[in-house]
């Protein structure tokens, strides 16, 4: 069967299923593709197809993830599902599969469990903007009061981690009912209702090109008679010739003007998100700019040295450390294009961090870096990746 080509005429959104092991994340993913396939918006992907997730590398870390795509009348979705809990932790922290929203799957028969809590906390730490809940396995619960109790527990848990627990849509159903063609009300209808809620409740992400301009500096050249050219890939936004920009990070912030934009040796009047460009900077000397800084729209990003982060520390088998580390550990933090040394402070009550752990930590960098919440980084020792992290909040 030939794969139908998805027409990109609808807004695109990245989502994923999260929740405790065996609560039905993968079954729900399969059920969504089955229900939407009837309307021609997907190709049905069976449970065992999704379950044997291929391995991929992100920031030097191997993660297993399954990707399916489907569309509703309003949107096109890329949906990610992970086989194991460790894969979720790694995926959310590295941002390997960016999530604009998540479907939290909770088994009605069991209620919230430890990983339910951990995934909600991770979603908060890594900045997942919105969550919709699917209360699964409702066909296994006869008592409607019990369902209400589980729903209340889930709402309280979401509120505890600063999600709007009272407002979040909770859809009750059964993924198995879809896959076994049994109860259409709990199966087919519930999945359609879930997708309606996802369409309506998960906000449409702003496209990178509509965000304020930012380009990490990869290289700096001096071109005789023309000035200094800075190269890199535009991360977001648009830069036009003649616009004023700032150079942020490592040293005091400087202002300059872009007098030319080049791509593939051709002159352009602008560069935009995704382009690999060379930007000619007015009156800027070769030694004024270095790799690791960013060019950005004035005032849009500030340099910082202290932040709180959520990090995953690689196991020995993944090529990470063989031993734990303690407070005052001093690795390098690789942001965008460069390593900066930083000092780690562990939270009260955390004596040490073992390889394979994920941990909330505070980091003090020795020089300021252009950063904002949700920025990803690698933790390295002498060029070897030993962990991955994401900025949860900025201190100063």
Swiss-Prot record:
tr-type G domain: residues covered: 10-206
A GO term, aspect molecular function: translation elongation factor activity
Residues that coordinate or bind Mg(2+): 26
GO CC terms in record: cytosol
Keyword GTP-binding: yes
Region (G5): 174-176
Region span, G3: 81-84
PROSITE patterns: G_TR_1, G_TR_2
Keywords: Cytoplasm, Elongation factor, GTP-binding, Hydrolase, Magnesium, Metal-binding, Nucleotide-binding, Protein biosynthesis
InterPro entries per record: EF-Tu_GTP-bd (IPR041709), EF-Tu_GTPase (IPR050055), EFTu-like_2 (IPR004161), EFTU_2 (IPR033720), G_TR_CS (IPR031157), P-loop_NTPase (IPR027417), Small_GTP-bd (IPR005225), T_Tr_GTP-bd_dom (IPR000795)
Subcellular compartments: Cytoplasm
Segments for region (G1): 19-26
Location of region: G4: 136-139
Domain of life (superkingdom): Bacteria
Catalytic activity reported: GTP + H2O = GDP + phosphate + H(+)
Family: Belongs to the TRAFAC class translation factor GTPase superfamily. Classic translation factor GTPase family. EF-Tu/EF-1A subfamily.
Subunit structure: Monomer.
Family matches, as NCBIfam families: EF-Tu, PRK00049.1, PRK12735.1, PRK12736.1, small_GTP
PANTHER family to which the protein is assigned, alphabetical: ELONGATION FACTOR TU, MITOCHONDRIAL (PTHR43721:SF22), ELONGATION FACTOR TU-RELATED (PTHR43721)
Function, in words: GTP hydrolase that promotes the GTP-dependent binding of aminoacyl-tRNA to the A-site of ribosomes during protein biosynthesis.
Name recorded for this polypeptide: Elongation factor Tu
